[in-house]
Amino acid sequence: MHLFKIISFIFFSSIIFAQNYSLESVDDCAACHDEIVQQWQTSMHALSTLDQDVLYRGMYEWAKEDTKGKITKKCKNCHTPYFYLSDTMLVNKEDRKRPVDCLYCHSIDSLHLEPKFSPMKYAANDNSLSDYHTIQGRDHFENEKLCMQCHAELINPNQVAICTTGDEFYNQSENKSKCQSCHMPNVKGYKSSESDSVSNVHTHAFLGPHNEEFLKGSVKISGKVNGNTLTITIDNSKTPHSFPTGTPLRMVLLKVIGLDRNGKIVYQNWQKNPVNEDKQALFARMFMDEKGNMPSPPWRAVKVGNESRLKPGEVRKITYKLSDAVSKISAKLFFQLAPVPILNKLKIDDPYLRKAHLIDEIEMELN
């Protein structure tokens, strides 16, 4: 990924720069930006390390054992971006364990062919009024380019694209919303302790699927019945990337239940496993290994075996045949951060990871 180039460039390019650069802590930032740091502390950026992210740790240890450690450096590029900094120049062993934090993102000067870091602080706009440090404005804080350093793509050793958010975004032309519009929306607050008044500030909670409220309504569903045919419409028109996106562990499930006049369940589109019972109700990206096994761990993949996610901007219609006994329909769309069998294998009991999170739901009376 591009991030490795970023890190390599900065920390191996200038000994003079390294000698003058110090790694401030998040606590230093909190002295003036307490409100923003509190938001960040709830984010997955703050929890990106092996110590804090139980799913990342489980997948990392599995990949490490399965590949004899050959691919784990790719994981650390983004989860602990200080990892690749030179021992002799900048970062001690403890700092190498730091998550994606204030200093890392706000020290990025430019994102051209060779991204450049600097001890200067950067943000969306210039600010020379601070007593503590000067801030220079950079465009990449107001577009997708900074985010895409980690969220664009991940290629496995077999040259199979594992994460494809960047391609999804750049290959669609209908919606060019910037990442920050949804994942860092404006909230009322103080930019720093020096601020005289409340203003609109981009939240640094970095909203995503680990925030249940953020998930709700991110994709909408609706239904229509014509005779004995039920059509469920799933609307991803507001999203400029596939849904779900990011790690291929994520999946979206559609559950349809039909009730008779007495409230008894007389129809279900699937009961135990949509992969076997109703493939059109599963929205996911699955990989196949060289032996034809699917799903395959991402690092073993030789090709994509199934791609059923909602495309950027897609509105998909799914039909079901109902019996005359069905009097009422309930349809729910759920988001799961990882398949339960994977969580079982990794011995992860985290309730949020195991929960099917409701995105949207409808109920329809048929007669």
Language-model segments: residues:
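Sec-dependent N-terminal signal peptides
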Residues: H2-I16
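Alpha-helical interaction segments
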Residues: I7, D28-C32, S195-D196
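A generic alpha-helix preference that emphasizes hydrophobic side chains
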Residues: I15, V37, C102, E144-C147, ...
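N-terminal intrinsically disordered, low-complexity tails enriched in polar/charged
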Residues: I16-Q19, N367
